[in-house]
Swiss-Prot record:
It comes from Mus musculus (Mouse). Isoform 1 is expressed in the cerebellum, but not in the cerebral cortex. Isoform 2 is expressed in the cell body of purkinge cells of the cerebellum and weakly expressed in the cerebrum and the brainstem as well as various nuclei of the thalamus. Isoform 2 is highly expressed in the cerebral cortex than in the cerebellum. Isoform 3 is expressed in the cerebellum and cerebrum. PDZ 1 domain is responsible for cytoplasmic clustering of isoform 1. Residues 1-79, 268-345 form the PDZ domain. The modification Phosphoserine is found at S303, S572, S613, S644, S647. The lineage of its organism: Eukaryota, Metazoa, Chordata, Craniata, Vertebrata. GO terms for biological process: actin cytoskeleton organization; G protein-coupled glutamate receptor signaling pathway; long-term synaptic depression; regulation of postsynaptic cytosolic calcium ion concentration; regulation of postsynaptic membrane neurotransmitter receptor levels. Residues 500-509, 774-784 have a biased composition (Polar residues). InterPro entries: FH2_Formin, FH2_Formin_sf, Formin_Homology, PDZ, PDZ_sf. This is Delphilin. The keyword Disulfide bond does not apply.
Amino acid sequence: MPATNQGWPEDFGFQLGGSGPCFVIEVAEGSSAHAGGLRPGDQILEVEGLAVGGLSRERIVRLARRCPRVPPSLGVLPGPEGGPTALTAAWLTRRFGRSLPLSRELLRLAGGPRPDAVHRERRRKAQEFSCQVDDILGDRLTAKEQVFTALKQFAAEQRVDELVWTLTLVLPSEAQGPVLDNLRIFIPKKHRARFDEVVSQGLLGKLCRARRAQGAQRLRRSRSEERPERLLVSTRASAAPRRPDEPPPRKATSLLGGRTGPGGPRRTVRVYKGNKSFGFTLRGHGPVWIESVLPGSPAENASLKSGDRILFLNGLDMRNCSHDKVVSMLQGSGAMPTLVVEEGPVPFASDSDSLDSPTRASALTSLQWVADILPSSIRVQGRTFSQQLDHLLTPPERYGVCRALERFFQHRNIDTLIVDVYPVLDTPAKQVLWQFLYQLLTYEEQELCQEKIACFLGYTAMTEPESSLDLEPESTPEPTPEPQPRSSLRASSMCRRSLRSQGLETSLSCGPGDCPEMPLPLIPGERQAGDGTSLPETPNPKMMSAVYAELESRLNSSFKGKIGTMSKSRASPPVPSLVGTSGPRTLSGVSWPSDRLLPSPCYDPLCSGGLASPSSSESHPYASLDSSRAPSPQPGLGSIHADSPPSPDPIRPPSRRKLFAFSRPVRSRDTDRFLDALSEQLGPRLSIVDDFLTPENDYEEMSFHDDQGSFVTNERSSASECVSSSEEGSSLTYSSISDHIPPPPLSPPPPPPLPFHDPKPSSRTSDGPRGPPQSLTKPLTQINHPVPPPPPPPLPPPVPCAPPMLSRGVGHRRSETSHMSVKRLRWEQVENSEGTIWGQLGEDSDYDKLSDMVKYLDLELHFGTQKPPKPVPGPEPFRKKEVVEILSHKKAYNTSILLAHLKLTPGELRQVLMSMEPRRLEPAHLAQLLLFAPDADEEQRYQAFREAPGRLSEPDQFVLQMLSVPEYKTRLRSLHFQATLQEKTEEIRGSLECLRQASLELKNSRKLAKILEFVLAMGNYLNDGQPKTNKTTGFKINFLTELNSTKTVDGKSTFLHILAKSLSQHFPELLGFAQDLPTVPLAAKVNQRALTGDLADLHDTVSEIQVACQSMAPSSEDRFAVVMASFLETAQPALRALDGLQREAMEELGKALAFFGEDSKATTSEAFFGIFSEFMSKFERALSDLQAGDGPRSSGMVSPLAW
């Protein structure tokens, strides 16, 4: 090899050509380039790590000759004639017609030769495979790219099923066989068995054909039809419309013994794994399924196969459990778990819609079944649920939504679902997904979810189907208004929700023909509130139905006989038509019979005719305690009450925007998370009020000045309802033109009215600027009735609204001013905080957030000095029917849970006990029935209720019926013994074998005997001073556990370390004595007394069953004697074998005890074997310390044994 690079590349035996990129033209045989692996056709990509793929030959030569390394390292792309990457790289070079970027695979050459034997064969196969793909697919470049993408994905993920699935979809059917056969050489050996199984059986092809046929034959209504293993626990709302002759959906309940769909046959298997692993791999989720089974494993011995779904484990339902939970349950299932599996093909997460993109990675994730849970027939805006998730959400957001749905399917908690999903669906476009989520709920959950969304978010049309709207088209044309700001509530959506509300009761009722229900057309430039793309920002009028109903009941009770006809016809209130006086803009809507506007009176408690106290706001949730006088309607235009005085000219308030305030619900983690997420979405337009509002006023809307635009005309602002706040700070102020919610009625004054005295104005300010009301064209009674009823008693003049002043902090007025007295903290204030930590806190803007947070810590409840008011005694609750309970509370509770889990009626369970065929009873069920069975005293008390079982509770009635079965407890014990005999015998046999084998190992171990002799010699030397005088002939073996307690003089070493060091120097063959005693540590864990007791219990149970068989005569109904007699005949040989093994084990144990000089009557097996187990572990630890060089040593001393 040359000493320098000046003659590169000719001196190294190869030549370059090309003007960018450059290729190896010729390589001399036997040269250093040939030995380094260069071949003709290789493309030069790197020189000493520098990218040279686009450089000419001359520049590459100059660069290489300046390199200090001889020869310079090259990064090349093998040509079509060689290299393991020829399969992919050669095709890609032809495909794109240019050199590959440096991120592709590179073959690094550093002077070492290439292996020829295996690589040459693989190169040849790769070339053949590449040519074969070219011949089969021809010019279909997309299909070629999918094939090689699948190969690359398999190289990264090693998923055989996905590789075969992709090739099955891409390649023609006649070409699949040859291509898969030639592809087998590239499959690693550990995956070839699975590859051969999938290819030979054609599982994926069958699955694909079955799914295509299934999708063409029927319209899928729910995911439960595709996944029969899922339990139907309640009624599901069908997404597709039903035919008129189709029966309504029926509520289905799960049965343990039944099947919910056309799944494969089920079978019960018992896996005898002992201390081994199961020997299978699991995949999937709810239920999990077996992907592969290892040959010779316990799973294969139990006849488990690939594709089996695990439905039950030891009687526990695993059909809806997650993958991690099933794995943890299997790990703790014991030595012989019982599985109920369902046969079927290997599940694969794909749908008919996914055939166009077979290599989608999301189709194989663990949560993909959530995205595919709705059938493809359910589409919104032309997309399915899965497609909308991919289109609208990012991968983290998709995972969050699917994870939230997964948790919801487990606990069925609507609140948690809303809290988890709402922060993700934060834009109008994303809120289309609510329409899909609505289809996954039961009918009861749909109503609850709709109510909660309306309560928290203020809209319902997002989740209501369009079919629920029953509106007639507008008959008369309306002038086209200008677009309104999107933040306001559309009049049409408000009217639709008002018309849909069946329970909305108001004090204003329209007579027949007076108030025709007409839809409001949408304003151009605005969206309908139910189109799935907008989020209304105003409260739902349905929420005010409770307020209207209460106020109307008070009004009707006071005016009984005068306006009784108003309650006959209850319809949704029409929306007044508002006409601007200073501009051409109008708002389309349902108009009153009159062309003029309705008033917007300002309600005040003084209108009731008396002086209101602070507590009088309870009688009217809309009442204001402001003592300022409210303006009356304009003179000459009528008013609500004839005797009301006129008001001055109205003052036009400035433009305002809405600020929403939500009263905090009951404190919980879910509500806190939801309100935090809500505040992040609505930002400064949300204020969380921590006062205890009544249910009638649990939603607040406050107004504030708009400094950033979104103005409305003064005429429109003057038409807003002016409702002042109460003393507690709860207010309901509608200040937008779009809030066409009629005001609640006035409470009638109690007769006779008190004289009114105008008080001085209060210092309190209202929540926002008040718009003066305008007048009525007619009295209100004339609007609703052709003939006006007698007028009510005259009212005192109302108090005018407060001046337009704004207090942004009114939302927290209750918590700041009217909280109870609390204990004071007796701290000493710092006079000068400048330069201290307290001065830094004052500069931190987070202190205001902490101050707001403190208000919700319920400090008044913990440190309050005022006693809470005593609860008012309410009406006596309805007394339930008295029942007699005989079982203890714990037994009754557990019996109820067991009955709900068994899904068996008392009659069915009685039939099982009489026939002695417990097909639906697991050993765990039988053990629980035995545990909760009544004792003798309880059985005696049950005799008094033989004639009147209805007086007993449900668990007691069940026990009473079970006591009618002859020898109830004996039958349960017999069935439990029959189900667990094999498991118990194997456990006892294993323990006895362990004792016998450990005894033989101790007696036959020559290494252990040599070590004991060495210890004896060392001890005699230390005890007597001379090795051959007055020596001890033996010692108790329990001294072996105390060897590490004898310290050396310096305290840095022990007798055990000296023993290990001496043995390693003079008898190294004795250091592995523990290998001759592998069973001793296991025998130390066997409890001899418990083992003997278990064997005695088996014989006692057999004797009891034999006596029961003799006492109970067989009959057509009672098969106890026949079944158990046959069982005992088969069980006797196993019991006799156990007895023989026990005698042999005890005999060997006694010999071992005598061999080591121990008393067989005073020493137990666990103590005897525990001594040797502890000695072995301590000796290994000491030896490890010495070998690691960190063991304690005696400095400056030479061991007397190191001769």
